[in-house]
Amino acid sequence: SNSDIEEIIMEEQLIYIIMFFSIVLSALCSMLEATLLSTPLSYITGLEEQGVKGAARLKKLKQDADRPISAILCLNTIANTVGASIVGSLVYEVYGDALVGVFSTIFTLAILFFAEIIPKTIGTNYWRSLAIPASAIINGMIFITYPLVWVLEKFTKLISSRADQV
């Protein structure tokens, strides 16, 4: 019937919308991580001495990179995992068993190229122009993921302290 066709079209659109947003969020995370890790502390110190707005924020993130990296990796993992789960179930619902593997392969390759390789290349090559704006976005990510990052920090410290005893 007409309403069944409309529902299938809406579900197909939802598949592509979720894939798009999952890839965009993952790409942002990859670029921010590469930018933060590629920016030398000496460069940040120079910006701070010149009075560049945001340099102090960037320096704080760089000097204690565990928290920003944890926040970025949490969001990246959530984007990839939730995106893949929802897309997989929608593909199964709309197309059945036959195309789940095909969509999974396409989605995996799309994440690899558009959410990992390309954004990390951009972050490592354009860190000078990205570092200050990236620090503001990373601070937002830390705020959003703070409870999860806090638990991960405690867990990491527990593992680290036990490693010293071995």
In which residue ranges do the predicted regions lie?
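Membrane-embedded alpha-helical segments of inner-membrane proteins
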Residues: 2-166
